[in-house]
Amino acid sequence: MKRNFELIPTNGIKINTLIEGDGKPVIFVHGWPESWYSWRHQINPFKKAGYKVIIPDIRGYGRSEKPKNVNSYSLKEITNDLIGILDHLKEEEAHIIGHDWGAPISWYTSLLFPKRILSVSGLSVPFNPFNEIPPIKLLEQIYKNTFFYILYFQKIGFAEKELEKDIEKSLRLIYCNSDAFGMKKMIDLALKNNLNEKDKKSLFLEGMNEPKDLPSWLSNRDLKYF
């Protein structure tokens, strides 16, 4: 099915955005490592329910522009991107739904722009308010010498070198080890004390199981698209 996309200028960059349907807008915000395509199964049901579906590739993802400066990827910048999309479409307000890393984006869009957001829904990640300790410092205190992926991602160039070596394999490992079945396997191993703890010098994909087959929710065609 041919989808309707628009490259929308917003907040100084251009964001690839799927726009379909009529009615009150619903913005869907994807997580990592994903794109608008993660919400493909929600498009038609929401259109039939009478909503305008808006699904951007968040800056840095998919066909949206990718600023080189790391500071360009703050929650403040990304929330401004979304509000700019509403402005471009001449929409005063919208519902917003986020999954994974898209959930904090959704929470903070509603927090920073309460008059523009009708409702907010977060999947996978609960609301986490800022506190006196910066998030990275807090994670460093919690994990110390233990591997944690967000801390690993702070090392500029490390994750890129590992994950871009074979992008399709990286995505296959990530998707198949972080879905409900993959997480259950890790929890079961942890409960039996058979889960090897990674130290902070480990690589992201280290210890992930190579799947023999893709899960029912992910086809080879889907994987190729991502």
Where are these regions (language model features)?
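Alpha/beta-hydrolase fold catalytic core
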Residues: 1-26, 48-51, 91-92
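A generic local structural motif
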Residues: 12-16, 39-41, 84, 106-108
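Flexible "cap/lid" subdomain of the alpha/beta-hydrolase fold that forms the substrate-access gate
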Residues: 61-65, 71-97, 101-225
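Short gly/ser/thr-rich secondary-structure transition/capping motifs
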Residues: 8-11, 34, 103
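Generic alpha-helical hydrophobic packing signal
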Residues: 3, 14, 43, 53-55, ...
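Conserved HGGG/HGGXW glycine-rich cap/lid loop of the alpha/beta-hydrolase fold
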Residues: 18-65, 99
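Active-site donor-binding loop signature of nucleotide-sugar glycosyltransferases
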Residues: 10, 58, 125
